[in-house]
A protein has these predicted regions:
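Conserved, well-ordered alpha-helix/loop/beta-strand core segments that scaffold catalytic motifs
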Residues: 86-130
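Acidic/histidine-enriched alpha-helical segments
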Residues: 1, 31, 127-139, 195-198, ...
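Short, well-structured beta-strand/strand-turn elements
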Residues: 17-26, 124, 194, 260, ...
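Small/polar-residue-rich segments within soluble enzyme cores
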Residues: 1-98, 411-412, 429
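Acidic/histidine-rich, surface-exposed loop or edge segments in extracytoplasmic proteins
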Residues: 92-102, 331-332, 499-510
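Ligand-recognition elements built from short beta-strands and adjacent flexible loops
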Residues: 271, 412-416, 433-563
Length: 563
């Protein structure tokens, strides 16, 4: 039982007689409850404090444990008859101090979209692991972050590690953006320069190919759009006499350093210096296409977000503010790591190339309706330590949307896909699903806001049809009834000409949608389906912890956020 339920129970007959006469003995225990299940589980994290030993601090909870845990109290206790203890009031007593509340930037609905899209693709590809991150372009606040790994014992995917934060690997072709940024900024090339994409590029006794394709002579812009490895030749020809100039250009962006994330475990980026003993004649061309260096998915996303954000490199953040009672203790503002990663002209060139990748290049399979996506595909072999490169691949797509006035940046990385290895197919399709659903949701919000601002009739709750019709007749509101004659539950939409009502369908075996309903109607429907309802707040239902349409399990708890 919850604490409020126990207090109500104590007032019942017999139970109100106390411990000895009524037999009501309450045993208290603390239980960690996750109303949203496994959503963002690793990023939300946990904290385990062991006296005399090193504490285990994971994710947001681990990072902000000093705020969350509060302070323990202290009280003198006296042992009395029956092996019981009673408190003794004295000046040594110290009242415990409750912890603060940490408000994250993660949007539950967007998190569900990202996690569902990633999980579906990992299952389809029978991949080893993957991650997807969605971030606000203008602020750097992370709105969704999904990390899934395959468990060979249970044959299911779960959140075991924060790959987006901690997995530093060779990014592959998504790094070509950084390579051309440096070459453009240092005046070595223009995107209109002509290059010959022969399909094979030799460096000493090694070579790179375009996967059997020959694109012929065209511009650097087209080479980027096609993800041709002629870019390795371009970088090599311009920097072979002074490789450190190229490396210094990368360091000026800031991608050689950690982002300084609030949560622990950020992977260390690795950009090889020209003085490194392992720097060989082929290091420069290999680096230019994302090998012989390492970056985490979140570090790559920060770079692409900077392009979308007019050159401003932001620190990704997970917490908006910390609150104690009604007082905000700490408010987190966007944090700038680099005010300008490049000039305006270079920025415009980069944007044009990223848009071209989706419009005409390797990611033309993810073109969206109603808005444009900009981004870059990446496919790289995964190094197997001393064994070299085997047949394991990493597929990725990083970009932002909409291409004009971007709202969100996003990266999807999948390791060990078995059916397809290309970033456009494996990760690009996940990116597109996230972008489509997020954009539709944001566009819907904007439309509703405009519509509501010009309506002359009041907002109406979703819920019981008969109750709604009685109320609307009493106050004289015109109703456009588009629902079926037999339906009990309706959705409403307020307009200039009155209120339109339609049938609210609840499919058997799936969690119903009760958002927009009053608590009484919502509770009636959910309990009818066998769910245990826990309301939080007052007003109408704004959020439900189990998304509508998910498979229903009787006895499962669902939290309703009211407002």
């Amino acid at each position: 039982l919850r604490n409020d339920e126990v207090e109500r129970l104590k007032k019942f007959p017999i139970f109100n007689l106390g411990k000895y006469k009524g037999g009501c003995i309450v045993l208290k225990s603390n239980k960690r409850v996750k109303p949203y299940g496994m959503l963002a589980n690793r990023t939300v994290g946990y904290a385990v404090e062991n006296e005399g030993k090193k504490s285990i601090l994971v994710g947001i909870e681990g990072a902000f444990n000093t705020y969350l845990k509060g302070q323990n109290g202290q009280m003198l206790m006296e042992k009395i008859r029956g092996n019981e203890w009673k408190p003794v009031e004295n000046e040594l007593s110290v009242e415990p101090v409750p912890g603060s509340d940490v408000y994250t930037s993660i949007d539950v609905n967007l998190q569900d979209v990202a996690e569902s899209a990633l999980l579906k693709q990992l299952k389809d590809q029978k991949a080893q692991k993957g991650c997807a991150v969605l971030m606000e372009v203008k602020t750097g606040f992370v709105k969704a972050i999904a990390n899934l790994s395959f468990d060979t014992e249970t044959e299911t995917y779960f959140e075991a590690q924060n790959h987006a934060v901690g997995l530093a690997s060779e990014p592959g072709s998504t790094f070509k953006l950084a390579s051309l940024l440096v070459a453009l900024e240092q005046g070595k090339v223009k995107i209109t320069d002509s290059v010959d994409m022969t399909g094979r590029y030799d460096f000493y006794d090694n070579y790179l190919t375009d996967g059997g394709k020959v694109y012929g002579r065209n511009t650097i812009k087209v080479a980027f759009e096609k993800s041709s490895n002629v870019i390795s030749q371009i970088i090599y020809d311009n920097y072979k006499k002074d490789p450190q100039e190229f490396i210094d250009g990368l360091k000026e962006i800031g991608i050689h350093q950690k982002l300084g994330l609030s949560i622990l475990g950020e992977g260390t980026p690795f950009i090889k210096e020209s003085t490194d003993p392992t720097f060989t004649g082929i290091t420069l061309p290999w680096m230019s296409i994302g090998y012989e260096l390492k970056m985490t998915p979140l570090q790559t996303l920060a770079l692409y977000n900077a392009v979308a954000n007019e050159g401003i490199l932001l620190k990704p953040q997970f917490v908006r503010y910390i609150k104690k009672g009604s007082e905000i203790q700490k408010y987190f503002k966007p944090e700038i790591l680099n005010t300008s990663i490049c000039s305006k002209s270079t920025l415009n060139d980069l944007k044009a190339m990223l848009e071209g990748v989706v419009e005409r290049g390797t990611a033309n399979n993810i073109k969206a309706r109603g808005f444009k996506i900009a981004g870059k595909t990446g496919t790289s072999k995964i190094a197997q330590g001393s064994k070299g490169y085997g047949n394991k691949y990493q597929a990725s797509f990083c970009g932002y949307f909409p291409a004009k006035n971007p709202m969100y940046s996003c990266i999807v990385v999948v390791q060990g896909p078995t059916k397809n290895i290309f970033g456009s197919v494996v990760s690009g399709s996940v990116f597109k699903e996230i972008a489509d659903k997020v954009y539709a949701q944001e566009f819907k919000k904007e439309n509703i806001a405009v519509e509501d601002s010009i309506n002359q009739y009041p907002y109406s709750r979703n819920g019981d049809k008969e109750s709604f019709l009685i109320a609307s007749r009493k106050i004289g509101i015109p109703v456009n009834d588009l629902s079926s004659n037999t339906t009990q539950w309706i959705s409403t939409r307020t307009g200039n000409n009155g209120i339109k009502i339609i049938t609210k369908e609840n499919k058997k075996g799936l969690v119903p949608n009760v958002i927009g309903m009053g608590l009484i109607d919502a509770t009636y429907i959910l309990e009818k389906y066998g769910l245990l309802v826990q309301p939080v707040g007052s007003g109408i239902v704004r959020e439900q912890s189990i998304r509508a349409g998910f498979k229903l399990y009787k006895g499962q708890k669902i939290v309703l956020q009211l407002g």
